[in-house]
Amino acid sequence: MYASKYKRGSSNYQRRGYSRYQGFRRTAIVTRHDGKRRQHQSNKSNEDPKMLVQCIRENQFGPDFVMSHNTAISTFINYPQLGKIEPNRCRSYIKLKRLRFKGTVKIERMHTDVNMDGLSPKIEGVFSIVIVVDRKPHLSPSGCLHTFDELFGARINSHGNLAVMPSLKDRFYIRHLLKRVLSVDKDTTMIDVEGSTLLSNKRYNMWSTFNDFDHDSCNGVYANIAKNALLVYYCWMSDIMSKASTFVSYDLDYVG
């Protein structure tokens, strides 16, 4: 599944004496082996395209990324397609290096409520972005991703220390968590969100593999990923009637 493993042959050379033709024979042997080695490397380079360091960007915004108060959204990061147009991948696996994201979230009051003092209450709430690694991606019987409540127990848990449910820890784990606590008097406010998580380092490499059954299935979406998909969970919790609209750009650095 990953890079091919090569077996290195070994040879032991034992000196038994010297001959005036020995140097010539050794030179001939080295030349012959070197020629074979070069031919093997040339054929290998023609068969296996070189994997390149690339970056694929995805913008998540629009009606599908608008949440009313006390709701959550689950989605995923698209991976590169198999093909020749960059950003692409040339094999059925890639090495994930780093995921960066940056964007804005717009919080709006949906209805103007007035308290006893004749003033509108503050918009108070917690907005969260959770990056989750799915070790063995596959859709549930309903054909959907796991919901926020299924993965973390309940949306209210975003107020505290968020953790994956014990029964799902073998498959999922949190890679990055961003939380913004809001308390504003305005009916509309904008907040900046930004983060980065390192997926591979000098001691550990994270690889993702794909189910490339046919040409149409090599598109890098969640159903195409066989190992280590990246999921994104958005959650907006507030007691005030409001909504959160996100516009977030994700940059995935990879080798593929």
From Swiss-Prot:
Residues 150-187 are annotated as: Interaction with Arabidopsis thaliana NSI protein. It is found in: Host nucleus; Host cytoplasm; Host cell membrane. A motif (Nuclear localization signal) lies at residues 81-96. One of its GO terms (biological process) is transport of virus in host, cell to cell. Keywords: DNA-binding, Host cell membrane, Host cytoplasm, Host membrane, Host nucleus, Host-virus interaction, Membrane, Transport, Viral movement protein. GO terms for molecular function: single-stranded DNA binding; structural molecule activity. Binds to single-stranded and double-stranded viral DNA. Interacts with the host nuclear shuttle interacting (NSI) protein. This interaction may allow NSP to recruit NSI monomers to the viral genome and thus regulate nuclear export of viral genome by NSP. Belongs to the begomovirus nuclear shuttle protein family. This is Nuclear shuttle protein. It comes from Bean golden yellow mosaic virus (isolate Puerto Rico) (BGYMV).
